[in-house]
Amino acid sequence: MTMPEYKAPLRDMRFLIDNVFDFHGHYAALGATDASPDMVSAILEEGARFCENVLSPLNRSGDEEGCHFDNGVVTTPKGFKEAFAQYVEGGWHGVAADPAYGGQGLPQSLGLVLSEMIGSSNTSWGMYPGLTHGAMSAIHAHGTPEQKDTFLGKLTAGEWTGTMCLTEAHCGTDLGLIKTRAVPQADGSYAVTGSKIFISAGEHDMSANIIHLVLAKLPDAPAGTKGISLFIVPKFHADSGERNAVHCGSIEHKMGIKASATCVLNFDGAKGFLIGEANKGLNCMFTMMNHARLGTGMQGLCNGEASFQGAIKYANDRLQMRSLTGAKAPDKAADPIIVHPDVRRMLLTMKAFNEGNRALTYFTAQLLDTAHLSSDAAQRQDAEDLLAFLTPICKAFMTDTGLEVTNHGMQVFGGHGYIREWGMEQLARDARIAPIYEGTNGIQALDLLGRKVLGSQGKLLRGFTKIVHKFCAANAEHPQFKAFVAQLNQLNGEWGELTTQVGMAAMKNPDEVGAAAVDYLMYSGYIILAYLWLRMAIAAQAHDDVEFAKAKLATCEFYFKRLLPRTAAHRAAVEAGSECLMSLPAEAFAL
């Protein structure tokens, strides 16, 4: 009666890497020769061993103990600091980092493969290196040569960690309202004053220094988001080692991810350094935010995978009632619950979302590689356009479905799923934050429909639908999947029609975009997973593991027959328009 032990799903990961997405051909085309098949295999094997043996055993205990706060000092749960030291010593922190600053220079996709295993084994622990990688990407993209030399080496080595400090008590989504101020100093630095809340890994004992990336406004800044600048504010000064004027005021007591320190940070004239251009800080921060949003989307997959592993074991062991078609285990008091159709429904839903979301993660990861490594400018731009389109979908669709998966995992356990000792409720609690932070899923949906799709006059959407159309044309006469290909092709066409419909309505009433956004995003996500499930099913037919292939084909069929029909409900909601949402006056919601 303990939390399920995580086992990295290496067979499925290898299937995607080798059979579906051809990572090796992908790396060769990009000139990433260091990412050899042997290197990829070693990262999978050794990464799995570290996550299974070091991180997974700390997941339950970390949740039970949580972080400790004492007069501004935060201590992580027992074993966390030692695990981070092992992680750093093993070179894992710099797998995809720039070799110029001590990294291994492997493609971003391999970093995400590793991140999945970390997040599945221990979501809270994974927050500490995850936020650091985001800070590294922002400094690498926008920092001066001196800033890169000062900070990236230590961050890459894991000697220092990083944060991003956006939210204040009065503003989360609307960053234009921030009150934190940065006053220029004679030496070219800035005195940063203000308070930030909900800062993940804002204070802890796992690294010698913490490098905060802080949004603040200059004294003469324009109003709103056009007046936001970004500053590097170290906990300890990089040159002298003296403590900077930034301190943790408290840590939050949360529903989940309890072993991740969520801090209130007070900046009292702390010495900071402008990164990027003045008043262009949001552009710099979005480099970090996009990295974080992909990582957050993956948290839906990670908690879902851990929940699924617990649920399938329990469903095979738990004996309750007899099968409706006759006893399946007549020598036992009852049949295992996995024989019951409703338990199968839940398990297959979990499996379909997990494996579909993993495919979406790997598909997106390859685009990251192309955007960073391709020598072809047009190819890089195409990849960046697809990334812009897919990022809000990855973040929102994967976290919403991941939450559904963890709820199913609890339900498979029945009453035991609600009891702490089994560990299933922790996974649901840990998963619940993912649709909220790094931009709520409602905001992701608004970004997708309003900015990415309609804002590009449909260009970004067409970039993806062309891929699907080409795939459908190539497989229209597939002997086994012809009907599913036709279903996907029809939805792919309707996707554009629905988009035009919303765009026309929005010209008359902008509320139409906000009213349609969430359902539009979910509609989009289901179509994208349908495309990926067909790719997996076709690839599985040639797989040498017959039982694995059968499971893929059966899950694809389940997805098309049981989950993809949800698109009809989402489309109907989009077409219903805004009036039924907005006609009721705000006063009518009063108690």
Predicted features along the sequence, with ranges:
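A structural-propensity feature for long, helix-poor, extended segments
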Residues: 133-135, 144-147, 151, 440, ...
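Alpha-helix capping/hinge segments and adjacent helical runs
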Residues: 4-7, 91, 257, 363, ...
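A glycine-rich, basic-preceded beta-loop-alpha segment at the flavin cofactor/substrate interface
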Residues: 198-200, 236-249, 254, 261-292, ...
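C-terminal amphipathic alpha-helical interaction region
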Residues: 101, 113, 455, 471-591
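A short core secondary-structure module
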Residues: 189-243
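Glycine-rich cofactor-pocket loops
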Residues: 31-34, 64-76, 284-291, 295, ...
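Amphipathic, small/basic residue-rich leader segments at the start of a protein or domain
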Residues: 1-126, 150, 579-591
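Internal maturation/activation junctions in enzymes
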Residues: 67, 80, 128-132, 143-185, ...
